[in-house]
Each structure stands twice: as structure tokens, then as C-alpha cells.
Amino acid sequence: MILVLVFICFLISLWLVGKNAEQKYQSLLSTIIYDRADTPLSVQSNSKDHYAIPLENLPADFSALLLLKEDRYFRYHFGVNPVSTVRAIYRRLIGQPAGGASTITQQLAKNLLGTEQDRTLANKLRETFYSFGLELYFSKDELLVMYANTVYLGNQLQGFESGSLAYFGKPLRETNFSERISLLSTLAYPNSRHPWQKTNQDFAKALSQQLAPAEIFVYPKVTSRYSFQNSAFFELQTLGVECASTCHSTIDTALTAKIRAILADFVAVERARGATNGAVVVLNPQTSEIIALVGSKNPKSIVEGDQINMALMPRPIGSTVKPFIYLEGFAQGLRPYSLVDDREYKYPIATGFPLYPKNYDGQYYGEVTLHQALSNSLNVPTLKTLEYVGLPNFYSFLDQKLHFQPIQSYDNYQYGIALGGLEMDLLTLTHYFSIFPRLGTIAPLRILQNNFRQPDNLPPQANITKNETVAEEKYIQLVHAVLSDRLTGVNQFGLKSSLNIEAFDYGVKTGTSRDFHDSWVVGYTGDFVVGVWVGNTENTALNQVTGQTGAGTIWHEVMNLLVNSPYYTNTSLPQNLITLLPITPEKNENDWGLPDDIISEHRTRLLEDRLIASPHHGDLFEFFPDSTIPLISHSESLRWTVNGESVGEGQEVGFKPTHSGNYEIVGQAENSDRREIIQISVIPPSR
């Protein structure tokens, strides 16, 4: 009975040894942040100051070579090879070197106990007992993997995966026969016989003949110095990404590297036009995962500005704010077919000076639809839409729906928001655009997987902690119908444009800040959202680089890269809640609206109670013989007089000035007392 109890206690002791070994083993592995494809982004050194990237499984042919070299009878012994042990003792007794008597299990015990340099008899006995515990607690395959992950290979490298990456620049599974032999040759003398040493080559050639004489050994090409911090981790560091234990990020390092190369190539070409920096963000809208985050063209560069993550730097966002203004307008009764008078207006602003908003090209286009206005990124109609929505209402939309936190008081922006003065960082702006492929909802951004806590300073700055509704889906569909229309915007962007990509159903919006300091494009499909910023870290102006010609060039390449990747599944965005309505049947003009719309009610909400649509009060015209100035009413037929003389009746008549000078134009309603008076000037032609 006593012997049975002793044996049971012995087994329990061995089991406890195995349990302790599991903890020791985990403590010897590096804390690693992986990308979404299990590529290491950042590897922290362990308690021994070694870089230890673990493998879960070993390639079968590598396992065979490892066992041939280190422990041919590994599958058959219980931690100790008695034949090798007796042979080693005999050799010591006769004064010869003991040779390699340790099994793989014993070597693993030595690594776990940290007794590699202290080869006393007591330690060897302790390692032997520990080996029995390991064999009892773990399977043979588990022990082999643990050994492969704890061997030291020189240069702070622990484990064959770390050694393979550092010496050959590839994971172990991708190494060839010669590279694997070179790694195995490092064992026993890791500091003097690693692959960067010539002694490794000499030994490896002999070892290959010993282990696999039929194979041809070719001296492998080694890398220079390997970094255990991928360049894609630069942006994660700036976000404060940390993991107490090994974790997985949402980042795709391979995609990030390709995008960074696109950005670097663009800057190399466009440096002459003043563009030295840029940033790109790629999101999965359905999961709100950050797939790629590029805030520098070269984070390893010492050039000023390259150490700044520009994806997190707030800059004026230009016209990229417009879809959100129109979204609120549609929610308050406007429609893509609503008319607005694109002309000069005067607005008082906080500075005390009047604001006379102009379009990008300096022209006014008269009466246009909101569809035309958004497609062509017209400023004045956007401002009129914001005026209709109301500044307090739009501030509330930004605050309450998007949880946006401006860097200045809204009172400092006012109607300047419609002209692109609002500052925002690219990551936040791209996140906000995800409401369109998400059909009106927003969710917290994610850069870490598997319920790891997201970094505290991950934009937006506050309060998006769960899925929230930003807008009704029907209004989202109306905005998308405009943003996805590539034909209506031809006037501003042309038929051949960087905004044209290899996908079908996608939306896009450009932006250019005042005096060309910032170039923006944000666009999306149902599968991803891509935001691009181009500018300079010191905020100097670009040389006539617009959103389309700057950020648009990068956006075009990145979108096509994604369209031709597994990320693109051609997810279509629905239009089931909106419909094409016959706006002016006599002209066969249709536009998007809601099925129950009363067209006449929504059509004129932005029009002032004016009779004359064109010309505008104060317009200037050059005088040419036989030139005609069209007089156009908003809707009803008018009786027209110029300087007291009748020139005709109807919704549109022509007036031919006879000389330069001032002209008073009167439009009199035919069926009421309403009339409108404007003045224009006809000036001599410029020479």
C-alpha cells in the first residue's frame, strides 16, 4: 500500500511538473501582435531578451530532419534514452567526451528551467525528473513543437520561426532544404555557428550529407538584419495599440505595404507640385475593421514629417462634408430634384465681414438641382442647403449622430462648414463615410480582433460604443444615388477621371481645402471604404493640386487594387426605398426621390419667392452687336419690360441691348399684381 501511495505521489509530482512547465513555456514566448493573416506586426522580446515567435505545427519534412539530427529515438523513449545515457556515463569514466546524450525532452527541460549554462550534476538530475513530467503531461508532437520554439539560434533569436524570419526573411514553412539544414547547424553553437557565420556554411554542407545524402545542398542566401517590428506597426503605435498577451489586429500588412508603395510613388512624382505627404485609410464598413492604415510614405525615414501619422492629423476637409449636409437636407424634405438658385449671395459671418460664396471655378450656374449641385460639388447650392437645414440642426447632427468633436467652437465655422472649413482627421472622416455602405448606421472602429480592448485614442474621439443609427436608410439611398452617378458630374470632373474605377456600384466624393492646402477623396463600395489625404505636414500649399488630381490619383490605384482582391465581393447597395420620378415629363427628365413624394412640394423648397430666375440683380454683360440676353422666369409666364419698354411675354424671352449702360428689367406676373425689378449693367467689351 505504501508503495502504491508513493507511486501515486510520484505521478502527481510529475503531473505538477508538467503543469509548471506549461506556465514556464508560455512565459518564454514573445508577446506578439499579429496582422489579420497571422503575419507578425510587432514582436516583444521575452524575459531572456530573446525574440520568440512560436509555431503551432512544424513542417513534416523539417520535423524529420530535426529528429534525425537531435533524437532519432524521440518517438520511443519516455524522456530519457537509457542507451545514450549509459554510453555517456561510460565515456566519462574512461575520460572521453560524453557526446550528445540528451534527448529532445531533456533539452526542452533545460530550456524551460533556464539551466543551459549551469551544467551541474544536480541540474542534470533535475532536468531528468522534469523530462519525465513533460512526457507524462504533453504528447510527443506537443513536446517537439515546444522544443522547436525554445531552442536558441543566436542573435537574440529563440525558436526556428524567429530564426527563419531573421536569417532568411521568410517563415519556416517557406524555407527550402538548404535553409533548414543551415538552421539545424546552428544548434549547440548558436553564437558562433549561426547562418551569418561562415562556420555555419561549412558545417551545414557536412550535415546535409549526413542527414540526406540524396539532397543537393546549396549555400542559402541570408538576409541582412531583420526587424521584428513591421513598418505597418508605426501607425498602430501612434494609436496606442498595446496587448498584454499575444493578439491579432485587423490590419493587412501585405495590403498596407502595397498602399504605402503607391503613396511613396505618388509623392516622388508630385513633389514638384508641392506634395510631400499623404495618408490612406481602408475600412471594412460591415465590421468597422481598419484593414489598412497608412499615415506616412516611409515611417523609417528621418526626413521631417515622415514620423507623423497624418491619418490622425485634423485638416480642413473641403467638399467631403457635402454629402452629410445633403443627407440632412433630404431628411428635412429636400430631394435630389429640388431646385436651388446658384447665384451670388451675401452672408454675414462671425468676423464681421460679409461672405460672398463662390463655386470652385468662380462661376454661377443659375437654377440647378441638388443632384447636379452635389455631383459637381457646387459650393453655393450646398450653402443654401445648409441654410435650409439650419446651423443649429447641423451642429446637432455632428454632435449627436456622429459624436464629432470639433477642434474649434462651431461659432468659428458657421456657414464656412459648407465651404470646407471644418477640420477632421482622415481616419474619422473615412469612418463617417461608412454610414453609406452601412445604410445609415455607424459602429465603433476596430483595430484589434477577438474582443481585445480597442485603444482609448482610436478616433472618433468619443462615445461611439455601439451600433447607432445616424440616418434613415431611404435618405442614405438618395445620397448614394447621387454619389454613385458618374455622368452628372462630367462638367466638373470630365469623362476621363481618376474617380472612375473597375467597380460598378460605388460612391465617391472629393475635397480641396482653401488655397490648395489639402487634397481629399473618400469613396466606398459595399465591401470597403477608402479615404485618401494629400498635403504637407507643415501645412504649406500645394501647387494647384485638387482632390481629383491629388488624392484622387492614389484613391484610383488603391480602389482598383482592392477591387482585384479577395476583399471585393461585389456587394451591391440597395435602392429599394427610392425611385426615379418623372420630374419634367415634357423634357423626359427623371430624378431620384421617394415613392410617395409630391414632386411640386419638394421641387421648390429652396427657391425664394422670386419671379425672375435669370439674369440676377447686379449681373454684368459685355456689349456685342446682335447679342441677346435671355430673360427667364422661375415658373410662371411674365410680361417683360426693359427700361419701360415691353420686350415680350412668357417664361423666357430674349432682350437685345442697343448700347452699353444700365438696364432696369421688370417681370410682371400675368395673373396677379406680383412683379420683380432687377438691374443689370452692359459694359463695353474687354480688349
What are these regions (language model features)?
Residues 97, 101-257, 261, 404-405, ...:
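Non-catalytic, structured segments within soluble enzyme domains
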Residues 64-67, 71, 259, 288, ...:
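Active-site SXXK
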Residues 75-84, 158-161, 304, 330-350, ...:
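Short, well-structured active-site flanking segments
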Residues 91-118, 226-239, 334-394, 442, ...:
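Conserved catalytic neighborhood of penicillin-recognizing serine enzymes
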Residues 1-36:
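N-terminal type II signal-anchor transmembrane helix
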Residues 34, 213-232, 348, 460-465, ...:
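Soluble, non-transmembrane domains of envelope/secretory-pathway proteins that act on or interact
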Residues 30-42, 58, 273-303, 396-399, ...:
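A short, well-structured edge-of-sheet supersecondary motif
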Residues 249-272, 280, 284, 293, ...:
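A penicillin-recognizing enzyme superfamily signal
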